[in-house]
Structure formats: C-alpha cells, structure tokens
C-alpha cells in the first residue's frame, strides 16, 4: 500500500520510478564504469579492425617478395619496412595477428568445452564420475606445463591446428575445477533436486541447469585465456614448434628476427610484431579483468 502511494506521489511530482535491473544489466554497468576495461577496448578495437580488414585496402600480401626492398626501413611504400627477403612487415604483422587470434580463439573454445564438460560431469555425474574426472585433472595439473607443452608439440607436430590442440590440452584443468566448485553448490538446490527426482538425465542437468549457471565463469575464463593462448602460440612458434613458415604469426616473425644483426640493424622486423603482441595481450587482459570484476558477486554487496 505504501509503495503504491509513494509511486503515485512520484508520478504527480513528475519523477520517474526507477526500474529494477537484472544481474546481467548490473554487471554490464560495472564493466562500462571500469576505466581499465574501456581502455582495453579502445586499444583492441583498431587492432582487430586492421587485422581483419587489411586484405581489403593493403596492396601487399604477406608473402609477396620485393627484392628491391630487402631490409628496407619503414617508409610510405612499406609502413613497417620490409624483412630480409623483401616481404612487407606490415602485411605480415597483420596476417600474423589473424593467425595468432585464430589459434588463440580456437584453442580457447576447445579448452572451454573440455573444461566445462569434465567439471560439470564431475559435479553432477555421481561419485564415480567425480573420482575419475578429478584424478584426470590432478594428473594434468601435476605435469610441468613447459615440458608437457614441448613434448606434446613435438609429438603432434607443427601447424595451425596442431598448435590449437596442444594449447587446449594444456589449458582446461583450471576451468574444470572452477566449474565443479560452482555446480557442487548448485546441485543441492531444490530445482536441481526436483529435476533429478523427475528422472532428468545427465545431459539435461548439464545443459539445462549447469551451463546457464556457469556463463559468468566461462566468459571471464575465455577472455583471459585468449591472452594466455596468444602468448603460448607465440612461444611455440618462436621455438619452431607452432605455426611453420612461410605462414606468418607473431611468434615465428620474432623467431626470424632473432639474429644479432637483425636485432641491431633492422629493429623494425621484430619491434612491430612484438609491439602488436604486447598490445593485444595487454588489451585483452584489461578487458578480462574488467569482466571478472563485473561478474564478481561481492560487487553486489558493495
């Protein structure tokens, strides 16, 4: 009664009644108020635009060779200069960004799917499923990551999709633990117990209850993991175990410029791909941190 009287008074005074907002809207508002996250978006947007659209407006292809431009410095003709065989460094930096992002996003999609399924099955599948899933997670997390990465890459071989598989197999255990912790709490709630009582199968529990209640974890994990995957791809390619030449990636461009002569005399051959790598990782981390803070349940209390 009092609320209706208060609402009528607000209407008479010409004031609007504040509309209630859901948790997703509040999370979006917190994200938009995060200056670091917005700064990350400002950094990442032009880089993504250039990486995705450069074939439409750049006259050079990544593997076009101009023998007259070998090791030439940045100029109006070659904005980032040319490498040791006359290839345009700007075109290769943009193509390297496309391949690095393709590898990163693909590996994150794969690792997110694996991590969610194993974590959800562990939480909702019963005692034996939990024991088997968690022992596999423990085994994966006890392996030294660098050694495991190098051994797996040498077994599977180099290539774009091989690199995707290698990074995904290294990245899923942390997510599976987070999903398991979230869904162990969820399975004790009445609506999940009611679904179990009505004979709902594991697939129904996973995708009807588990997935919608894990979206915040998945979004934050995937965003932060993209930056980590870009670094892993660059490291593998730098060591010759990732994307093989002549395909361009930021890692193998840095590998090609590792000689002392190039480092000292032709710094544009490593400075621009290295700068793009740092810029992309920094921007994505800012965005991921902003998403993590926006979805943090403690922010609701503050």
From Swiss-Prot:
Major localization class = membrane
Annotated stretches, region: Disordered: 1-22
Q: Where is the ABC transmembrane type-1 domain?
A: 97-288
Q: How does it sit in the membrane?
A: Multi-pass membrane protein
Q: Where in the cell is it found?
A: Cell inner membrane
- CDD domains in the record, alphabetically? TM_PBP2
Please give the start and end residues of each transmembrane region.
38-58, 101-121, 147-167, 200-222, 230-250, 268-288
Which Gene3D superfamilies does the entry link to? MetI-like
Give a yes or no for keyword Transferase in this entry.
Answer: no
The answer to whether UniProt assigns keyword Cell inner membrane to this entry is yes
Q: What GO terms in the biological process aspect are recorded for it? A: peptide transport; protein transport; transmembrane transport
Which GO cellular component terms are attached? plasma membrane
Q: Which UniProt keywords apply?
A: Cell inner membrane, Cell membrane, Membrane, Peptide transport, Protein transport, Transmembrane, Transmembrane helix, Transport
Q: What does this protein do?
A: Probably part of an ABC transporter complex that could be involved in peptide import. Probably responsible for the translocation of the substrate across the membrane.
Q: Name the family.
A: Belongs to the binding-protein-dependent transport system permease family.
The UniProt subunit note reads as follows: The complex is composed of two ATP-binding proteins (BOV_A0347 and BOV_A0348), two transmembrane proteins (BOV_A0350 and BOV_A0351) and a solute-binding protein (BOV_A0352).
PANTHER family linked to this entry: D,D-DIPEPTIDE TRANSPORT SYSTEM PERMEASE PROTEIN DDPC-RELATED, OLIGOPEPTIDE TRANSPORT SYSTEM PERMEASE PROTEIN APPC
Tell me the protein's name: Putative peptide permease protein BOV_A0350
